[in-house]
Amino acid sequence: MIKTAETYHVPVLLKESVDGLNIQPGGIYVDVTFGGGGHSREILSRLSEDAHLYSFDQDADAEQNVVANPSFTFVCSNFRYLKNWMRYYGVESLDGLLADLGVSSHHFDDESRGFSFRFDSPLDMRMNKRAGKTAADIVNEYEEAALADIFYLYGELKNSRRIASALVKARTQQPIATTKDFMAAVEPLFKREREKKDMAKLFQALRIEVNHEMDALKEMLHSATELLKPGGRLSVITYHSLEDRIVKNVMKAGNPEGKITQDFFGRAETPFKLVNNKVIVPDADEQERNPRSRSAKLRIAEKK
C-alpha cells in the first residue's frame, strides 16, 4: 500500500527543530533524514528561490514523498556519505543541518520489513533493502560472543550472554528466519512484566547492528562539523541514550568521545556553542497526538 507523507511518518518536534536552524532565506540546508518529508517541507516553506535544500534517505521507499520544488534535491543514500554528496553537488559549506534519528513509522508498520515484533515477518531490518546483511544473517552467522556484545552495547541488556546462547542453541535446530522464530528463542528469558520493553531493546540492538547506525551517525556528524559555516546550525533529534550521548559529545567537545582538546595556550577548542543548554522535548499535547515522540530529545548547536 502506498502511504501518504502524513501516514509514512509524523514529524517530531517539527517547529522546534526547524526554528533551531535559524533559517537564512537564501541559505543551503540539509535534512539527512527525509522520511515522510515533514521537516523538509517546513524548511522549504522558509527558503527563498535562490536557496537550496538537500534531503537524504537511504530507503528508496521514501522517494514517494519527494517534494516538487526547484530548490529541492533528494539524495537516496545513507547520510554517512554526506560529505561525498556535497562535493558531488559542488556545495562547499552549509547554513544548517537537521537530523531526526528516529525510525520512521513506515518501517515499524510495514509487516514485510521485520522492524517490529508486532508482526510475524522476515527478519530483515535493513533500511536500505538493496544492501548489507539482514538481521537473520547476523543472528544465524555471528559468533555467540559477538551477538552478546551487540545486545549488551546496543540494547543495554544485562542478560545479553544468555540471550546469545539461546539464539545459538535455537539456530542449531533450524535457521532463525522470522521475527516469530527470533522471539520464540528468547522469550523464556524475559520477565513477563518487562517482556515488551526488553524485546524492544533487543530489536533495537539488532537494527543498530544491521544498519551500522552508530558508525554512520559519527561519520555524518564529523562531516557536518566540517561543512557547517560559522553561525551555521546543527539541529538533531535523538531517541535513545546511545545516539544522544554521541550527539551531546559532538556538540560539546567536537568528537563522539566528548574529549575537549586545548590549544597552545590551554584554551578549549570546541567547534560549537550550545543553543539550548537543556534538551527540548515534546510537550504533553504532541506526546498524546504522537506516542512515538515520547522519548525524543532535541539538541541544537551553532558552529563557531
How should these model regions be labeled?
Residues M1-K304:
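S-adenosyl-L-methionine-dependent methyltransferase catalytic core, i.e., the SAM/SAH-binding region
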